[in-house]
Amino acid sequence: MKRDLVFLVTLISLAFLSLLRSGYPQHIAEESCSVQILVPGLKGEAGEKGEKGAPGRPGRVGPPGEKGEMGDKGQKGSMGRHGKIGPIGSKGEKGDNGDMGPPGPNGDPGIPCECSQLRKAIGEMDIQVAQLTTELKFIKNAVAGVRETDNKIYLLVKEEKRYKEAQLYCHGRGGTLSMPKDENANNLIASYINQAGLTRVFIGINDLEKEGNFVYSDRSPMQTFNKWRSGEPNNAYDEEDCVEMVASGGWNDVACHITMYFVCEFDKENV
C-alpha cells in the first residue's frame, strides 16, 4: 500500500514538471533550474533504545484502594495519662475487729446528781440482762443436744460467726473450738453435722501465726492425723488461714472472715 502511494506521488510530480516545461520553454532554456522532489522514504528499522528520560510530573491521586487485612498486633505502647476518677464502688463486707487501742486519758469529773445511785443500778441490770441473754442462747443450743466421748463434750452452736468470734464464744464458756485429734473424734463431729442437716462448720485448726504451719486452737501442733480433702490446704487468694469440716468429715482451709456455724469442745472434768 505504501509503495503504491509513493509511486502515485512520483507520477503526479513528473506530470507537473512536464506542464511547466511546455508552458514556459524560453524561460526554462534561459535559466537552468534544479527541482528537488521530497518523497517520503520507506520506514526504517527500529533504532537503539534511548537513555532514560527525566522523571515525569506526578500524576493525579488515584482512587482509594480496597481495605486490606488486619495487620499483626503492635507492640505495647507507653502508659497513657491517668483517666478520670471512677464512681464510688459498692460497700464492702465488714472487716475483722482491729486490735484494742491504748486506754484514753481520764475524763473530767461529772456533775454530782441525786440520780447517780439509780443510774448505777440500771447499769448493773443491763449487764445482768446481757449475761442472761447470752446464757439463754447457750442453754438453747445445749438442750438441742450434745455429743460425748469418754473425756470430751461437743456442742454444735447454730449461730453464724466469724472464726475469731466463734473461738471467743467457746472460750467464754470454758471450752474451745473443737479439735479433732483422732479418727473417733473426727467421725463423731462429722456425724453431728450430718444429723443437724448442715454442710460445714468451723473447727479449731488454723495457721494464723505462720502460713502453712497449722495448729489447734489451744496452739498445740498437729501430729500425723489429718483429714485434708484432695488439693487442700491450698490457701486460695492468699487468705485462707482457718479450717472448716464438711459433712463427710473432710477438712478445707477457708477465709477466717466468713461466717458459719461451729462446734465447741469441753473437757468433762471442767464441766
UniProtKB/Swiss-Prot annotation:
Coiled-coil ranges from the UniProt annotation: 116-148
Keywords: Calcium, Coiled coil, Collagen, Developmental protein, Disulfide bond, Immunity, Innate immunity, Lectin, Mannose-binding, Metal-binding, Secreted, Signal
UniProt: Ca(2+) 3 binding residues: 211, 238, 241
Record keyword Calcium present: yes
Keyword Endoplasmic reticulum: no
Biased composition (Low complexity): 55-64
Cellular compartments annotated: Secreted
Biased composition, class Basic and acidic residues, residue ranges: 66-75
Xref: PROSITE patterns: C_TYPE_LECTIN_1 (PS00615), C_TYPE_LECTIN_2 (PS50041)
Domain Collagen-like residues, every copy: 56-115
Any one Gene Ontology molecular-function term assigned to this protein's record: oligosaccharide binding
Disulfide bonds: 170-264, 242-256
Expressed in which tissues: Expressed in the tongue, crop, crop mucosa, coprodeum, urodeum, proctoderm, colon, lung, ovary, uterus, testis, vitelline membrane, kidney, ureter, liver and skin.
UniProt-annotated binding residues for a carbohydrate: 200, 240, 244, 252-254
Signal peptide: 1-25
SUPFAM superfamilies registered for this protein in UniProt: C-type lectin-like
Family designation: Belongs to the COLEC10/COLEC11 family.
Record-given protein name: Collectin-11
